[in-house]
């Protein structure tokens, strides 16, 4: 599964280029730049299941580290600091993971 048909390739490339440098990732900026923030709740949920690579129903820290790579081959991994900040922003219930509803809330924030 990919983001084809949900997000425009040009928008995804621009979003990835905007955070190519280490410690430059900002989830709000990224979600707006790639167009995900403007999508419906259902489309955001589809994106969640692409990012949830092990299909556990949650995005864990190791999947967040590889977050950018789910949007484009050759993208960098998030740094440890970026990963922890991203997890803290999305993990509303403190279980150390981001569930689908938490992800929708994060994208739409």
From Swiss-Prot:
Residues the record lists as binding Ca(2+) 1: 52, 54, 56, 58, 60, 63
Residue positions where N-acetylserine is found in the record:
2
Q: PROSITE patterns annotated for this entry?
A: EF_HAND_1, EF_HAND_2
Q: Keyword Acetylation on this protein? A: yes
Alphabetized SMART domains for the sequence: EFh (SM00054)
Every EF-hand domain range: 39-74, 78-109
> Its GO CC terms?
cytoplasm
Stretches of the chain forming a coiled coil according to its record:
none
Q: What does this protein do?
A: In muscle, parvalbumin is thought to be involved in relaxation after contraction. It binds two calcium ions.
Q: Which family does the record assign?
A: Belongs to the parvalbumin family.
Q: How is this protein named in the record?
A: Parvalbumin beta-1
